Amino acid sequence: MKLIVGLGNPGEKYAQTRHNVGWLVVDELARRAGGSWRKDGEAEVCEVRLGTAPGEKVLLVKPQTFMNTSGKAVWPLMSFYKLEGEQLLVVQDDLDSPFGLLRFRLGGRHGGQNGVRDIIARLGYDRFPRLKIGISRPPAGRDPADWVLSKWRDEERETLAELVRLGVGAAELWAVQGLAEAQQMYNGTDLRPQPPAPPAAPAPAADGAPGDAQD
């Protein structure tokens, strides 16, 4: 058994906010696997099998405690199933990565993400994988707390849908083949618009072309 935890806040008003991108990933994982959600303590959970049949047994988790106390939902499940840190993947939003970036990280500090902060505090260790999905820092003068609870703009939705699709593939690869394979495949993901290439330099004129000086 492995756990894939999508971080977010419960309630319709939070469903399409930046902070809930982790929920979008686990919801899509559940949909593709044909699973159904049920209540289990402080979480909604969905048991699925990922990968080639018979597949890897995975419990998808959506904490129902609100973001800042996510560990309250995660710790009992880790304890009940007697899981270690490497069997847990947390899918989270990441303020410090530009929107369009997706990457795995093993362990380390919470980086200001309060759901991760609480999971670390309740588990008593930080050595578990995270799948970090960039949402960018807010525009100058805007409070980060307000930014993470803001809804996606219409012009961001195409990139968001692709990030979620890639996040699903990344989480499934982690579950089936492990962190190293998933990092190698997905840590270069960058969906940011690329600047246009500079115009090519004009080719040098051939000898004897019009305008050349002649002997």
From Swiss-Prot:
Entry keyword annotation includes tRNA-binding: yes
Pfam families linked: Pept_tRNA_hydro
Record's compositionally biased regions (Low complexity): 203-215
Main subcellular location: cytoplasm
Biased amino acid composition, Pro residues: 193-202
Subcellular location: Cytoplasm
UniProt GO molecular function: peptidyl-tRNA hydrolase activity; tRNA binding
Region of interest: Disordered: 185-215
UniProt catalytic activity: an N-acyl-L-alpha-aminoacyl-tRNA + H2O = an N-acyl-L-amino acid + a tRNA + H(+)
Keyword NAD belongs to the record: no
Stabilizes the basic form of H active site to accept a proton (site feature) positions: D93
Classification via NCBIfam families: pth
Family, per entry: Belongs to the PTH family.
The protein's assembly and partners: Monomer.
Function, as annotated: Hydrolyzes ribosome-free peptidyl-tRNAs (with 1 or more amino acids incorporated), which drop off the ribosome during protein synthesis, or as a result of ribosome stalling.
Name of protein: Peptidyl-tRNA hydrolase
